[in-house]
């Protein structure tokens, strides 16, 4: 994030570039492993052909064109450690349950057949970014400022995408830990000490050691599963809590409604489309032009950005994952919109004003 923050601070002083222009420069960023992963899935989808039904079953039955099977196998071998909510060691990886990946590929195949070209759109964003960078540099008041601005723009575009790499590598470690823990869980489930191999993820290491030594933690596991499932159903997640449990946002004076939801500008531009409220990316079905409305996103969600025309997110700020990816894909985005997934109805037509940080419906 440091190169982007440096660009946002220095470029306006050097060239009088505004926020919208900086957002254009930050679109179509290269060297982003997550973006490359998304575009790879898109390319695979374009080889499936017109029949895209029951893709998961056909993949598991090996009933797909050879190049598609090879592409999916290779993708899962290299990126199968990823998933939505991937920093939780208890969440199954794509390699264990490829349904989410195959659902995305199926959706890509449908939208590609409808004339939508996500790869071309990303390339167009990169080209527009280069044009904007040249325009910004040309406005520099002197040669020294111009050289520094050009250097800054080039370095940021070359380096910003690498911000995903540390987490990508960290998740490799989490996935490896999951494999080992689940192997222990499988053995314990086989002896009847636990009901399910995944029960081990509801214990800490000390408790797991006790279980291996013969302790009975089935009641503890059941209690924690109940709490976990209850928390998964929670509709509202506070962005900030005080030490006494108070949520500061509930103490703020609520302004009269003007027919719009208010949040933080994350990616400039204005777009009108059909809202798709998504809480589980594995169950999402986005058509080209749809606006993604979500509680929050992580890299496991980013394949959805290839078909979305805008983003509304309940959590996060201008430098959150969803905001950054929206800028890279050149789609308007508003983040930090309280209760967006409940106040916006799936299928409703909404307008996202990325620059103003508002959503109208």
Predicted regions: what they are:
Residues 23, 85, 187, 258, ...:
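Short, flexible coil/turn micro-motifs enriched in small/turn-prone residues
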Residues 60, 80, 238, 263-273, ...:
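Glycine-centered flexibility motif
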Residues 248-291:
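Phosphate-handling DNA/RNA-contact segment within nucleic-acid enzymes
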Residues 275-290, 295-361:
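Acidic, glycine-rich flexible loop/linker segments
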């Amino acid at each position: 994030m440091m190169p982007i923050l440096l660009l946002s601070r220095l470029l306006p002083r050097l060239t009088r570039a505004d926020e919208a222009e900086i957002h254009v420069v930050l679109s179509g960023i290269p060297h982003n492993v997550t973006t490359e992963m998304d575009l790879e899935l898109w390319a695979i989808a374009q080889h499936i052909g017109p029949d895209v039904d029951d893709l998961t079953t056909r993949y598991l039955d090996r009933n797909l064109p050879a190049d598609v099977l090879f592409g999916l196998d290779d993708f899962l071998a290299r990126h199968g450690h990823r998933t939505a909510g991937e920093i939780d060691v208890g969440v199954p990886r794509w390699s264990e349950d490829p349904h989410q990946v195959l659902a995305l590929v199926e959706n890509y195949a449908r939208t590609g057949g409808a004339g939508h070209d996500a790869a071309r759109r990303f390339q167009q964003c990169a080209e527009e970014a280069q044009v904007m960078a040249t325009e910004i540099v040309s406005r520099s008041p002197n040669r020294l400022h111009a050289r520094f601005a050009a250097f800054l723009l080039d370095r940021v575009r070359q380096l910003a995408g690498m911000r995903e790499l540390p987490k990508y590598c960290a998740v490799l470690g989490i996935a490896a830990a999951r494999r080992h823990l689940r192997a222990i869980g499988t053995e314990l489930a086989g002896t009847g000490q636990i009901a399910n191999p995944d029960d081990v993820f509801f214990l800490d290491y000390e408790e797991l050691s006790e279980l291996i030594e013969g302790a009975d933690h089935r009641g503890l596991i059941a209690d924690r599963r109940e709490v976990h499932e209850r928390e998964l159903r929670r509709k509202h997640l506070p962005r900030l809590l005080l030490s006494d449990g108070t949520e500061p946002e509930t103490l703020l004076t609520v302004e009269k409604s003007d027919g719009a939801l208010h949040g933080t500008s994350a990616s400039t531009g204005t777009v009108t489309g059909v809202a798709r409220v998504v809480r589980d990316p594995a169950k999402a079905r986005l058509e080209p032009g749809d606006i993604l409305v979500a509680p929050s996103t992580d890299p496991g969600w980013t394949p959805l950005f290839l078909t979305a025309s805008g983003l509304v997110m309940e959590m996060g700020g201008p430098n959150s994952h969803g905001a950054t990816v929206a800028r890279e894909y050149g789609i308007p985005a508003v983040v930090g919109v309280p209760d967006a997934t409940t106040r916006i109805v799936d299928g409703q037509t909404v307008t996202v004003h990325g620059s103003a940080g508002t959503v109208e419906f």
